[in-house]
Each structure stands twice: as C-alpha cells, then as structure tokens.
Amino acid sequence: MKNYLSKIYVIHYTKLIERKKHMISEFDKWNVDIPWEIFEPYDQEDISQLDIIEHFDMMAFRGRHSREMKTGEISLCTKYKKILQKIIAEDEGDYFLILEDDVIFKEDPLKYINNLIAKCEAENINFDCIFMGEAALRVGDNRDVFAKKPYPSTNGLCTVLYTRSAIERLFASLENYRITQPMDWEFNDRFRDLEFEVYWGKAI
C-alpha cells in the first residue's frame, strides 16, 4: 500500500501527562511508522501578552461572545497556528494529519487515510481537508461515509487531514487576520471564506 501521509502532529497540553502516554500507546498499537510529533510549546501558562496581541483580536472576541477568551482556548489556537507554520517551514510532503491528544482510533488510521487519498486521486476528488473525528455530532457514528460538507463544515478539530496547499492558505489567512473566535468556529468561517473543499470521512 502506497503511503501518502507525510506526518502526524498531536496538539498536547504538557500538564496532561497521561494523554501523552495515551497517544504514544495509540501509535504503538497501530504500528504508525511515519514521522509523528507531539507538539508541546505554547501551553496556557506560557502564553505572553505579545503572543495574544500577535494572534488575537480580543475586542472582537468579546463583541462576538460577550466574554473573555479562556486561556485554554488561547493556547489551543496558538498551538494549532504554530503547527501550520512548522509544517510550511520544515516538513516535506503533501498530506498532514493534525490530532488532539485524546484521540482513540477505532481502526488502523494509516490504512484508512492512505486508501481514502488513493480513492480521491483515482476519482479526481479535490479536497482541502477531511474530518475523521468522532466528536460532538458524530458520537457513536460508525458509518463508512465520505461526503462533501457545506458550511458549517467542522465537527471539532480532533482528527483532521489537510493538504499542504490548504495549510499554506489557512496559515496565510491566520497571519493576515487575527483570531476572533474559539478555534472550531474560527476555522468554520476561514474554510468558508477560503472556499475550502471540506469533506467528512468515516469517524476512525
């Protein structure tokens, strides 16, 4: 089986030590033999005021949500953006999987993803990102689905496959316009504005 996936990143909060152990166990269980990285910088305790000014429009956030942005939300957004930046600057390849650190795979993730990308290539299906997480609306969903998802297109950000082109465009957008929402809804609007081809795959 051809391997299409270039690297896996895991967003991790370092104080949750058991979650890091869990993710390493998941990779061992499924014999994940491609590069992966547990991304730890920018914990909520380490975010500086300069980080906030650079990445966030807090006045707009308060106007949208009538509250202050939580430190955990700030950290998650910053980690995600820094991963996108790192991929662009340091990694080769065309496809990247970004995970949150509490993912439990129900099947071999590499096999499923490689087969799905092969299907897309064979059938000339162009996608920017594919959601494969069992979160929120998809708890207990075991259907083998693959369909284009209109706005609002996100369902949590726990298991998302991106193309390099999508990562480059998304990062450029985040550089040009500061974050004004929690990450899930921020990405919903960015994907719409960037005219992303968003699909939902099987919740693996």
Predicted regions and their residues:
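An acidic/histidine-cluster motif and surrounding catalytic segment
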Residues: 1-99, 103-204
